């Protein structure tokens, strides 16, 4: 990939935009591309997609993912697009599009949540996360010159806009479901289920403000540098399904707690951080309580919600993750890191390469000179200073 992420994004002439984030972002991107002299066509797959493309012309796809390559082939004869854009490269329709584009020599660019949040979003040619084309060889980065620090506008994504757009997306998807009978969403697509989860998430957040108000001061003082931080991801994260050996987050919790009970220093603690976007969907307290008893961990396990990640990282001794982008944040804080899945930053010298059993007492620190080179390259090649909401 040549040039920076924005240059790569703009190097096409005719664009086909598939499914984007819930909301108007991909419609806005299409209009932006057209304002720069490119051609851009949106494809809608459900009522939510169509609702957010209602102010511009679009193409509708009504078939199954298996039939998508044939549809793309026929479309390409009429509209010879040279670039496909999508959000996330693990959705069934996007997987089919990626395979077809690769065979035809057509550029496939995937958007994703920012690797370096919150001021950035990710755009990569060929794939994102563990499908990224970024080199995994540490010597590649060590030989790089220092990257100039780009100007960064201090953007902050709006949680309320995200919720509002999600609400309308799910409602329109349900309202027009009979017009897209073969569409299958990559996650739950019921507005009523999601609404219940969001209401539950709100009340749990208020509850945790009370029940966990003393936890962070304890971690910052009494347990400073005495705890390992295990980061949880959302239960239906495609990065777990596609880029790890785990079938469920619960399998990860079990493995980490078992290993910690057997090999970690007896005076250490394990802090398990729940993902804030999963607050209304899943709760692991019964599982963690049962495993704590089974593995004889007693009071050495702390299960936390909604505590600020920078503070948790700053006071942690080390960090374990499946493949969350929180792993990059751990490296920013110069913390020893063990990756249990596949991640683009799981590079020798940055992360611990041995078994989890040995990690707890390993004399390992990330090479921060290497990380500086890696982060600079990552920023220039994959990040765009923007937000989705």
Swiss-Prot record:
GO BP term, example: polysaccharide transport
InterPro entries the record matches: Capsule_polysaccharide_synth
Entry annotated with the keyword Cytoplasm: no
Keyword Mitochondrion: no
Keywords associated with the record: Polysaccharide transport, Sugar transport, Transport
Protein name according to UniProt: Capsule polysaccharide export protein KpsS
Organism of provenance: Escherichia coli
Encoding gene, per UniProt annotation: kpsS
């Amino acid at each position: 990939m040549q040039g920076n992420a924005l240059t790569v994004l703009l190097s096409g002439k005719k664009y086909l935009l598939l499914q984007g984030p819930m909301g108007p972002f991909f419609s806005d991107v299409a209009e932006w591309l057209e304002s720069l002299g490119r051609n851009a066509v949106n494809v809608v797959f459900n009522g939510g997609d169509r609702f957010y493309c209602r102010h511009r012309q679009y193409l509708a796809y009504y078939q199954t993912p298996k039939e998508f390559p044939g549809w793309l082939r026929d479309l390409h004869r009429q509209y010879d697009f040279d670039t496909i854009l999508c959000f996330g490269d693990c959705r069934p329709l996007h997987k089919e599009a990626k395979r077809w584009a690769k065979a035809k020599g057509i550029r496939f660019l995937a958007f994703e949540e920012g690797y370096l949040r919150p001021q950035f979003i990710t755009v990569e040619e060929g794939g994102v996360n563990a499908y990224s084309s970024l080199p995994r060889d540490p010597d590649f980065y060590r030989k790089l010159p220092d990257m100039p620090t780009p100007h960064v506008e201090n953007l902050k994504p709006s949680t309320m806009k995200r919720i509002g757009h999600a609400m309308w997306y799910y409602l329109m998807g349900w309202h027009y479901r009979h017009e897209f009978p073969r569409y299958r969403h990559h996650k739950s697509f019921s507005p009523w289920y999601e609404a219940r989860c969001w209401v539950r998430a709100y009340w749990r957040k208020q509850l945790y403000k009370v029940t966990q108000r003393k936890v962070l001061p304890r971690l910052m003082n009494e347990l400073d540098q005495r705890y390992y931080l295990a980061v949880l991801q959302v239960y239906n994260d495609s990065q777990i399904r596609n880029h790890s050996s785990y079938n469920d987050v619960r399998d990860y919790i079990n493995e980490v707690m078992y290993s910690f009970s057997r090999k970690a220093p007896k005076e250490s603690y394990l802090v398990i951080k729940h993902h804030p976007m999963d607050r209304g969907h899943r709760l692991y307290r019964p599982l963690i309580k049962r495993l704590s008893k089974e593995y004889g961990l007693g009071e050495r396990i702390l299960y936390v919600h909604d505590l600020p990640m920078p503070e948790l990282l700053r006071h942690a001794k080390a960090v374990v993750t499946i493949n969350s982008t929180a792993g990059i944040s751990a490296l920013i804080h110069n913390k020893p890191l063990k990756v249990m899945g596949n991640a683009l930053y799981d590079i020798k010298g940055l992360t611990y390469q041995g078994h989890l059993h040995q990690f707890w007492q390993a004399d390992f620190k990330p090479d921060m000179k290497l990380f500086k080179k890696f982060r600079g390259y990552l920023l220039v090649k994959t990040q765009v200073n923007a937000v989705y909401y």
